[in-house]
Amino acid sequence: MPVIGTFCVSVDKDVCVNAQSPGKCATCVEVCPYGVYEIDAQGQVHVNNYNTCVGCRICAEFCPANAIRINPAESEYLSRYPWTFGQIEEIHHKSLTGGYLLRGFGTAGPLPHFDGIVVVPSQLASESPRDKYREECQMEVVIGEDTAEEPITLRYPILFPAMSYGALSREAKLALAIGAAKTGIATNTGEGGVVPEEPYYANGYADPERKEQKWAPGGYLVIQWSTGRWGVSADYVNAGDAVEIKIGQGAKPGMGGHLLGAKVTEEIAAVRGIPVGSDALSPCRYYDVLSFEDMKKMVAFLRDVTDYKKPILMKLGPSRPYDDVRMAAEAGVDAISIDGICGGTGASPDVVTQGVGIPTIACIPPAVRALKDLGLHRKVKLIALGGIRNGLDAFKALAM
């Protein structure tokens, strides 16, 4: 793919009609208004002048074999902003279908993130470690030590966030459970119900009788309680080691969950309690929670259902971190997860994922301040979610 001008022009010779039969097709030559293509004496089409390509993609639209690709040689934000290809394609999609773009994953584009933060090291003014090998570091985190009979102790201050069965395959869910068991951390069911093997896999056992631990030291399973109540029962709530109340998430704050019907197989339908092939749509809020007092009652209800044995967590999206975290803490939960705009999802309107919420790094300081103002920052644990990609991101989040 030669790159000379602002745009890269590539032709897939394996599918190009002209490449297979010279002289048979020259649509790109005919429709390009800028002379990018030419046809030689043998009837073969070639890219003649890359510099004249303006990225209109008329050639790609008219190519009968869909063999042409036009991509920016530099960021679209420099070459085409604000009318990027993505913006144009979205307008076409809305015009043709009358609907919005629905996609997975998370936000894309230049948002403030952990890359813009650096770590200040120790030197003369503060004590430095002996070296990275011998310095002792206490990383255990206990959740629910003051309120639950069976608090959970994470070996490291990280966990796998909620990703539901359906958005992820059965194999992926069990792989996360085994990973949690091997590292001594927690994994989360998400709002789609629990895979039958998930609870004992997360605890490190390969069989439901839990006779012999296979994956040491063993981890934990957090059961998510969401607005859709998918697969919810007393047995479900007690299947794990902690319960998380889902209020929102980073990739689609202000909205409920959405699992596309194409992903709802017989097995997933059985777990969620819905018809095969139907979209699973969770409400944006709890219809039985109409006030702050109702929220406190929900926390108390879950403590009662779990016989006061399990910690209760709450997951928030990126809205008003200070006020939201303060209310969650006052409702009596043991830990609060706050998910920034860089978090992921299985399905969400593109316009919401791209344009609603606040960055993860902007969620953490006001959330910490809310707990400190209540005098609960040593009691209620704060969990930062959303685009934490590696150990350095995790370290920066902890430092904040």
Locate each region found by the language model:
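Glycine-rich, proline-tolerant flexible connector loops at the mouths of alpha/beta enzymes
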Residues: 44-47, 192, 196-201, 252-256, ...
